[in-house]
Amino acid sequence: MKIAETEDGVVLEVFVRPRAKNFRIVADGDEIVIFCEEEPIKGKVNKEIVRELSKLLHRKVELLSGFTSKQKRLLIRDAGKSEIERVLLEQAG
């Protein structure tokens, strides 16, 4: 997993697949893949990712880069690396 701890929280690198049947997180080798229901129009996918990860992790989530790309970097505020890894692995099954 591409996760780095910073003084602000945890930076998470993900690959996004839009237009899925439901929102889900999958661990694919060393990569985290997030399947989103929304279409990649007018930031809908970005909003869905931030909203769903915030609910899942109970933390503030911000998009750092990848606003128009499938490769994204997210900041999860006030979180530890091990906590985020654990929750993501549980979700990824």
Task: Please identify what each model-predicted range represents.
Residues 54-59:
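Beta-rich strand-turn-strand
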Residues 1-50, 62-68, 72-93:
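Contiguous, often N-terminal, cationic amphipathic patches that form binding interfaces
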